[in-house]
Amino acid sequence: MEFSQFKVNALMEITACPDLVFVRGQGSWLEDHAGKRYLDFVQGWAVNTLGHCAPEMKRALAEQADKLMNPSPAFYNLPSIELAQRLTSASCFDRVFFANSGAEANEGAIKLARKWGRVNRNGAYKIITMNHGFHGRTLATMSASGKPGWDTMFAPQVEGFPKAEINDLDSVRALIDAQTVAVMLEPVQGEAGVIPATREFMQGLRKLADEHGILFIVDEVQTGMGRTGSLFAYQQFDVIPDIMTLAKGIGGGIPLAALLAREEVCVFAHGDQGGTYNGNPLCAAVGVAVFDTITAPGFMEAAQARTRQLSEGLLALSAKRGLRGERGMGLLRALVLDRDDAPAIVEAARMLAPEGLLLNAPRGNLLRFMPALNVTEADMARMLEQLDGVIAAVRK
């Protein structure tokens, strides 16, 4: 079937898309309408924890679909209880609210913090966030984000999100006042160019929060569920946050997100928060399958081996091509280029024949890598070899 036969004009345009339609996927590979295969190192922007069409997920979907799909959040259902128990047992948090997207989870975190401020800090409502941070695309989460240009895109913004600089504790300290209720950040800023917070900064934020009686919120929408080498990124900094949000990898490709909080922060009254599909058993059952797979013996050790392979491969490529190194945590990594030709490299990689390569360029001088956590050693080596060839071809 030719691309021109697809009625793509029925879709509202929100981004520029190449002239291809993906029709199937398996593991680290996608196939388009013309039968061309692509090695996928984007995986839905770090969503597909187990790759495309993982058998564990398909099995969970089929089994749950045969039992119960959507009873309403007004009633308990078994998969949501089971997933909540797993998440709280594996973290420092006591309670979970399930949502459908990272933006919705972060919106919930903002509401929970503001409610806590009303109850415990005389109506404090300001949440300090970071320049270049990314928290979602609702009006409140766009306002919380520090993405350049977003302050005017749908003006006026939601008020109450002063911006500090990541890894600059003094910039956070200077913004704290009587109306401050929390500080919120991503442990690794993904859209900003895969910039990890330092251990000193994360521990300093926890100390600042304790000194001023405010909350410490981690947005682990992209970093959670094994992506950075531990189940949750905050665990690598030896800090205990008050609130955490998850999405992307928790569902492995199914719309699922979570807002987690410590008991003393759970101040929502009945009716303060809700949603039609929150805790949907079909999605939660898949979440259980993803959780059980990545916490099974040997899984994270294998992912850590692929992390070393990716990091060492990118460093070798950087040295060979005169680039500026690599950075990241776990299987969320970036190759820093010496010029702004990342978009051209992404396009050339996709156009490779007979099989393409899917990469991501959040910045003009940077490539981001977000493979499935179970990517094979052979596919990792193949990507590194293809990338070397593409960079050479683009820079002829």
Curated annotation (Swiss-Prot):
Pathway stated in the Swiss-Prot or TrEMBL entry: Amino-acid biosynthesis; L-arginine biosynthesis; N(2)-acetyl-L-ornithine from L-glutamate: step 4/4
Required co-factors: pyridoxal 5'-phosphate
Compartments where found: Cytoplasm
GO MF annotations in UniProt: identical protein binding; N2-acetyl-L-ornithine:2-oxoglutarate 5-aminotransferase activity; pyridoxal phosphate binding
Reactions mediated catalytically: N(2)-acetyl-L-ornithine + 2-oxoglutarate = N-acetyl-L-glutamate 5-semialdehyde + L-glutamate
GO terms under biological process: L-arginine biosynthetic process
Co-factor remark: Binds 1 pyridoxal phosphate per subunit.
Residues the entry annotates as binding N(2)-acetyl-L-ornithine: R137
InterPro entries on file: AcOrn/SuccOrn_fam (IPR004636), Aminotrans_3 (IPR005814), Aminotrans_3_PPA_site (IPR049704), Class-III_PLP-dep_AT (IPR050103), PyrdxlP-dep_Trfase (IPR015424), PyrdxlP-dep_Trfase_major (IPR015421), PyrdxlP-dep_Trfase_small (IPR015422)
Modified-residue entries (N6-(pyridoxal phosphate)lysine), positions: K248
Positions that bind pyridoxal 5'-phosphate: G102, A103, F134, D219, E220, V221, Q222, T276
Entry keywords, A to Z: Amino-acid biosynthesis, Aminotransferase, Arginine biosynthesis, Cytoplasm, Pyridoxal phosphate, Transferase
Keyword Amino-acid biosynthesis applies: yes
Top EC category: transferase
EC number per UniProt: 2.6.1.11
GO cellular component terms, semicolon-separated: cytoplasm
Similarity section: Belongs to the class-III pyridoxal-phosphate-dependent aminotransferase family. ArgD subfamily.
Note: May also have succinyldiaminopimelate aminotransferase activity, thus carrying out the corresponding step in lysine biosynthesis.
Subunit field text: Homodimer.
Name of protein: Acetylornithine aminotransferase 2
Organism listed in the record: Bordetella parapertussis (strain 12822 / ATCC BAA-587 / NCTC 13253)
